[in-house]
C-alpha cells in the first residue's frame, strides 16, 4: 500500500510540474501578445494621426478662406468636425493602451483644488456647444491635494463633457467635492439634470466603446478612460443610484498629509 501511495504521489508531482510549465508558457504567450497589441496600437495610431492632422489643418484653412454663406464652408466644417472626432478616438485608444500596459506617466504634485476646478469650469463653458449651465459648487477656501493635475483635469472634463451631451438647454451641470477624512479620500461628483441613465445600463457605461445613445457624438471610451485612470490613482468611480434628477457620477481620490510626502 505504501508503494502504491508513493507511486501516486510521484505521478501527481509530475502532473503538477507539467501544469506549472503549461501555465508559465501560457503567461509568456499572453504577455508577448499584449506587447505586440500595444506596439500595433501605437504604430497604427501614429500612421493614422499623421494624415489626419493634415486634413484638420487644411480644413481650417478652407474655413478661414471662404465666405460664411458659402456652401463650401459647411463642407469644410463637416470635414474638420469628423477629423477632430477621429483624432480624439486615436488619442483615447492610445490612453487605454498605455493605462492597460502601465506605460501612462503620472506626475504628482501639490495642487490647489478650488482654483484648478474653477479653471476646468471656465474651459468647459468656453468650449460647450449647448446652453446648459456648467457651474462649481464647493468650499471657497483653498484645499491642497496631492495629485496629477493633468490626469485629474482629464477625468473631470471628460465627465463634464459627457454630462453636456445629455443635458438640454436650460439644464445644469454641477461639479462638487467633499473631503472624507475618516476614509482618507476626497469625493468628487458631477451632477446633471439631463436624461439620466437606465439602471440596466449603469454598470455598462464604463466599458469600452459603450454608448448610451448612438446618435450622440463621442468615441465611447471617455468613461472607460476615467475608470482606468481613477483606479490607477488609487480611487474608484460609480453612479449614484439614488439620484433621480438626471445622472450623478462620483469618484474617490486618496488624500495625503502634506508632511508625509515631503519627508
Can you say where each PLM-predicted feature lies in the sequence?
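Primarily the dimerization/phosphotransfer
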Residues: 18-64
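Helix-loop junction within the histidine kinase core
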Residues: 97-108
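Short conserved segments within the C-terminal catalytic ATPase subdomain
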Residues: 127-136
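Short conserved segment of the HATPase_c
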Residues: 57, 197-209
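Short alpha-helical Gxxx[C/S/T] motif in the catalytic ATP-binding
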Residues: 222, 226
Amino acid at each position: 500500500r505504501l508503494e502504491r501511495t508513493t507511486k501516486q504521489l510521484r505521478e501527481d508531482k509530475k502532473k503538477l510540474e507539467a501544469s506549472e510549465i503549461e501555465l508559465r508558457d501560457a503567461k509568456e504567450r499572453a504577455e508577448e501578445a499584449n506587447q505586440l497589441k500595444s506596439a500595433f496600437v501605437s504604430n497604427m495610431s501614429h500612421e493614422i494621426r499623421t494624415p489626419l492632422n493634415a486634413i484638420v489643418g487644411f480644413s481650417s484653412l478652407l474655413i478661414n478662406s471662404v465666405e460664411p454663406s458659402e456652401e463650401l464652408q459647411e463642407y469644410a466644417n463637416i470635414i474638420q468636425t469628423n477629423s477632430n472626432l477621429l483624432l480624439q478616438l486615436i488619442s483615447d485608444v492610445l490612453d487605454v493602451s498605455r493605462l492597460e500596459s502601465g506605460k501612462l506617466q503620472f506626475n504628482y504634485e501639490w495642487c490647489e483644488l478650488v482654483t484648478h476646478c474653477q479653471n476646468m469650469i471656465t474651459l468647459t463653458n468656453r468650449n460647450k456647444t449647448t446652453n446648459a449651465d456648467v457651474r462649481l459648487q464647493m468650499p471657497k477656501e483653498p484645499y491642497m491635494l496631492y495629485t496629477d493635475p493633468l490626469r485629474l483635469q482629464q477625468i473631470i472634463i471628460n465627465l463634464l463633457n459627457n454630462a453636456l451631451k445629455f443635458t438640454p438647454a436650460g439644464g445644469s451641470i454641477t461639479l462638487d467635492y467633499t473631503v472624507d477624512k475618516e476614509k482618507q479620500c476626497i469625493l468628487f461628483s458631477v451632477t446633471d439634470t439631463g436624461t439620466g441613465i437606465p439602471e440596466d445600463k449603469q454598470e455598462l457605461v464604463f466599458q469600452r466603446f459603450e454608448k448610451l445613445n448612438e446618435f450622440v457624438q463621442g468615441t465611447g471610451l471617455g468613461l472607460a478612460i476615467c475608470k482606468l485612470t481613477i483606479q490607477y490613482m488609487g480611487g474608484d468611480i460609480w453612479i449614484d443610484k439614488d439620484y433621480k434628477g438626471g445622472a450623478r457620477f462620483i469618484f474617490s481620490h486618496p488624500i495625503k498629509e502634506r508632511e508625509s510626502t515631503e519627508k
